Amino acid sequence: MTEKIDTRPWVEKYRPTQFDDIVLDPLNKKLLKNIIKQNSFPNLLFYGPPGTGKTTTIINLINKYQEVYKQKNKGLMIHLNASDDRGIDVIRNQINQFVNTKTLFGSGMKFVILDEVDYMTKNAQHALKYLIQQYSVNIRFCFICN
């Protein structure tokens, strides 16, 4: 019998999968818990050095929010790495299509997570600004940068 070897990097293999497992300073943890408690999710910008848990924190915060408000697994989240696709095409195609698509199971807050947003081109930033202004009622944008 062959044993399956997990070849993922250590940080991926042991990444926290629950919001409560994330280690944060008490003030920031309280602020993020209040987002869930008060059902008031703002647009977010996380910045800091690589490997400090920004992406993990946002993903788990959104998952917890969706779990509490019965929106989990309804296709309400898109996560893109802006350093992979830095141009305006990713905004026009993927994000624009996502924000304009109706949800299959009724209502719910949609989330756009953009990692390494500081590497986006100027044109892509302007297109993104337009989307934020147009869809701020029912879409939340979470930006991560170094």
Predicted feature residues:
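P-loop/Walker A NTP-binding region and its immediately flanking N-terminal helices
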Residues: M1-N146
